From Swiss-Prot:
The lineage of its organism: Bacteria, Pseudomonadati, Pseudomonadota, Gammaproteobacteria, Lysobacterales. Pathway: Porphyrin-containing compound metabolism; protoporphyrin-IX biosynthesis; 5-aminolevulinate from L-glutamyl-tRNA(Glu): step 1/2. Homodimer. It comes from Xanthomonas campestris pv. phaseoli. This is Glutamyl-tRNA reductase. The active site is at residue 50.
Length: 426
């Protein structure tokens, strides 16, 4: 099996395609199990965020992964990237460190990678290969962020959106802000808003208790999601980031809110993928809609300023990729030896148990020992004997040369391993 990563992100696909390829809520474990069920796949993990959807798999080839993803979201092939082996390792290290993020060095992605690992592990789609890779990824990301300033004073998509709101509303502290959701992105937005002060903070969420917790931390008011439409007209600024599969805020709702506000402008930030706010809201006069793709331009200055730290982190990743691949190669070289030892041990234990039973049944010891010796010799030598016989028929000089090194001629031994009789156990 080969290590593959297949995916699309904010650099290769626009938000409307990314939302089609997103796996949110209960869809993620179902998708994982479906992916792992493919005969070509032995291990699988799925990373799905607002900016990327990526499949990590131990698979025979990549075509089956592409076909599977396009079954979920058609017409993606022109927007996909794929990496294998060392380049797949490098890609995951860079993603977890924040080097492949829209906001360079943003810290949320490491937690999202850990969540992807935890979900895959909980649903039994990880094996030793991917599990080892993710564990090493966490270690590399921690080191890169500790040894460089790539994660210093991080700028998130949420903080960028809040800054834009502050720039757009000279007196944001006199405005009412509505937050939809209670996940990490909304938590960050609430934190930045409470630091800058707003007149009134409303937090709407499907699970009211989560909204109440967030509201108590930041001096806001919690609302059930069912009350969203009723309070929409009160909001000067809206931030939304949920895992809903369908838009929560429609064009009709915003039109109605604008009429109730007597056309007073509204600023809306849709930080979710799939999107929470209907795209056509941006066509309304007095409604100003920003998506995560719009925010990419706003964070470009931050990206340039953090490039030096990113270069240092890239150097750490290069070194860690080389070490990880070297370890994998060393393990691969050891694998045949481990299989050989395991085969020898299991054969010995099986035949020894059989011999002990024969002695217990009263069979003469000399006869038991002779049968044990013959059976052990034949069982251990049958696989190499058969392989060497095929090599001789196929003129496989590489294998016969290796056999000469493994079985050198010595006094008292046959001149060639081919001369061992291929007898069955008695």
């Amino acid at each position: 099996m080969t290590l593959w990563v297949l995916g699309l992100n904010h650099q290769t696909a626009p938000v409307d395609l990314r939302e089609r390829a997103a796996f949110a809520g209960d869809a993620l474990p179902r998708a994982l199990e479906s992916l792992r069920a493919l005969p070509q796949v032995s291990e699988a993990a799925l990373l799905s965020t607002c900016n990327r959807t990526e499949l990590y798999a131990m698979a025979e080839e990549a075509h089956s992964l592409v076909t599977w993803l396009e079954t979920h979201a058609p017409a993606l092939s022109g927007y996909l990237y794929q990496h294998q082996e060392a380049e797949a390792v490098r890609h995951l290290f860079r993603v977890a460190t924040g080097l492949d993020s829209m906001v360079l060095g943003e810290p949320q992605i490491l937690g999202q990678v850990k969540d992807a690992w935890a979900v895959a592990r909980a649903h039994g789609t990880l094996g030793s290969g991917l599990d080892r890779l993710f564990q090493q990824t966490f270690s590399v990301a921690k080191r890169a962020r500790t040894d460089t300033r790539v994660g210093a004073n991080p700028v998130s998509v949420a903080s960028t959106a809040v800054r834009l709101a502050q720039d757009s509303f000279a007196r944001l502290n006199e405005s009412t802000v509505l937050l939809i959701g209670a996940g990490e992105t909304i938590e960050l937005a609430a934190k930045h808003l409470s630091e800058g002060r707003v007149r009134r903070l409303l937090i709407a969420n499907r699970t009211l208790a989560h909204a109440q917790t967030l509201a108590s931390q930041h001096g806001g008011f919690a609302l059930p999601l069912t009350d969203l439409e009723r309070h929409l007209a009160e909001a000067d600024v809206v931030f939304s980031a949920t895992a809903a599969r369908e838009p929560l805020v429609t064009r009709a709702q915003v039109e109605q809110a604008l009429r109730a506000r007597k056309r007073k402008p509204m600023l809306l930030f849709d930080l979710a993928v799939p999107r929470d706010i209907e795209a056509s809201v941006g066509e309304l006069s007095d409604a100003y809609l920003y998506t995560v793709d719009d925010l990419e331009r706003a964070v470009e200055d931050n990206r340039r300023g953090r490039r030096e730290a990113a270069d240092q982190a890239e150097a750490i990743i290069d070194l860690q990729v080389a070490r990880y691949v070297e370890t994998l190669q060393a393990n691969a070289r050891q694998a045949p030896l481990k299989r050989l030892r395991a085969f020898g041990d299991s054969t010995r234990d099986e035949l020894l148990a059989k011999a002990r039973q024969q002695l217990h049944n009263g069979k003469p010891a000399d006869e038991v020992l002779e049968q044990l010796a013959h059976a052990l010799t034949n069982r251990l030598l049958h696989p190499p004997t058969a392989a060497l016989r095929d090599a001789a028929l196929n003129n496989d000089l590489e294998l016969t040369t290796a056999a000469d090194r493994l079985f050198p001629e010595k006094p008292g031994l046959p001149t060639s391993p081919h001369s061992y009789p291929d007898r069955e156990d008695r």
